[in-house]
């Protein structure tokens, strides 16, 4: 079993409750936004990284609830999902390579580096400046 670590910011968190698709539970997951360096590391492993408005994103899935640790490595007692923009490291297991989706990424655990406030720092870095905002 090969493990890797990827650092980024939470875009979507489903670590306490299962994600839903068309009314069905589809498992636990976390979607990270990441910088180009982290995205390049994943791409080098044959992981498909999506681009959303100029920001690299990848979903890490699990069939089980995902352990969340604080920056000291201690288990966090959580009552709600991780907020958008939380800076984390995801330890993940390499799955099989799929011809369309690339290397499968299975979340093992998450280490919180800095709690988010709802914004993703990377989201506006690549945006063009406009006065119409």
Give short role names for the model-derived ranges:
Residues 50-74:
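Extended, solvent-exposed segments with strong compositional bias
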Residues 28-30, 90, 108:
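Hydrophobic residues positioned within well-ordered beta-strands of beta-sheet architectures
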Residues 34-36, 94-96, 114:
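Beta-strand elements of well-folded, non-transmembrane domains
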Residues 1-3, 116-133:
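Acidic, gly/ser/pro-rich intrinsically disordered tails
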Residues 98-118:
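OB-fold/S1-family single-stranded nucleic acid-binding modules
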Residues 1-59:
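OB-fold ssDNA-binding interfaces and closely related basic DNA-contact patches used
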Residues 41-45, 102-103, 122:
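A short secondary-structure junction signal
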Residues 72-88, 94-104:
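Exposed beta-sheet edge/beta-hairpin loop segments within beta-rich domains
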């Amino acid at each position: 079993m090969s493990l890797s670590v990827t650092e980024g910011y939470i875009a979507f968190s489903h670590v306490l409750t299962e994600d839903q698709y068309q009314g069905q539970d589809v498992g636990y997951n976390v979607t990270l936004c990441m910088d180009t360096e982290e995205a390049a590391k994943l791409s080098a492993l044959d992981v498909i990284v999506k681009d959303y408005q100029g920001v690299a994103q990848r979903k890490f899935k699990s069939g089980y609830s995902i352990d969340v640790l604080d920056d000291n490595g201690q288990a966090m007692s959580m009552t709600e999902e991780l907020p958008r923009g939380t800076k984390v490291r995801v330890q993940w297991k390499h799955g099989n390579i799929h011809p369309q989706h690339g290397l499968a990424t299975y979340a093992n655990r998450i280490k919180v580096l800095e709690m988010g406030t709802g914004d993703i720092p990377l989201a506006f870095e690549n945006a063009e400046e406009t006065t119409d905002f």
